[in-house]
């Protein structure tokens, strides 16, 4: 089977939810692709005053995106920095922690279950056979215990995933991104990119790649990966003399903090299956049009997916998996925050937003 189907799979997974702070709708669709490698997480109540939303676009398989959707928000919540009120640091650490957790026997077993290579029952049996070392989990705040087994030396997956997540806490929005999924906010009908697409040809990315011993060919890292940052992709993270953030490909996210205000119309998180077809401003304009007649946010997302789906696979655009989360805030408060509009720039030329790590 090639990378494309003969006819697209247009059935969608859609969902809506709300609490006292916000409401969201989401939708995902496999489309023309031979397999579905996107995943997402929408956690309305990460704690009493915090919501978490994330999109994960896998490549080389679905296991890393599914792993992130299952565990990344848990790592944010369990980190000591989060408990101390430092959301940005907890996000940064959670991205790197994904790579660590996917290694060894435990990581191999979790990925095998998520990849349907062993069923959950088999995984449980294997977990009993290859049991955690006594005492090891006591030193890990997330109780991710080391396991003995035939895959104890597993270096982690060579497949990978983007991660673009938003944490809403009180009046603050934290956005963390690694890869080319994107987060955009509409403020007074203007699109503002809250994340930067990490591509190998960006100067800072190129410098890191070359210093780490990699190369760029045809816009791809070592001629194969069209992203410069991702979770997983461990084959690009094997230089033992470099820290994680300086490897050829790194999971290090840009973290951006924004004060929400009453001018904010909505927030969008979406994988590049959307952004390859529409600019940030085009998507914001399209959503505003739909919101004039449609109140259910998941339906708006579905209309975006249908709008982006290509009639055939000849062009490439509109043929990817598609996932989108749309968020509207309740009772926002005035703010002096200034954002730099980025949708007005040439498509694909996005300045890095101010960030705090």
From Swiss-Prot:
Residues 23-329 form the PPM-type phosphatase domain. Residues 331-357 are annotated as: Disordered. One of its GO terms (molecular function) is metal ion binding. The keyword Manganese applies. Binds 2 magnesium or manganese ions per subunit. Keywords: Hydrolase, Magnesium, Manganese, Metal-binding, Protein phosphatase. PROSITE patterns: PPM_1, PPM_2. Mn(2+) 1 binds at residues 57-58. It catalyses: O-phospho-L-seryl-[protein] + H2O = L-seryl-[protein] + phosphate; O-phospho-L-threonyl-[protein] + H2O = L-threonyl-[protein] + phosphate. Mn(2+) 2 binds at residues 57, 272, 320. One of its GO terms (cellular component) is plasma membrane. Residues 348-357 have a biased composition (Basic and acidic residues). InterPro entries: PP2C, PP2C_BS, PPM-type-like_dom_sf, PPM-type_phosphatase-like_dom. Its EC number is 3.1.3.16. Its cofactor is Mg(2+); Mn(2+). Belongs to the PP2C family. This is Probable protein phosphatase 2C 60. It comes from Arabidopsis thaliana.
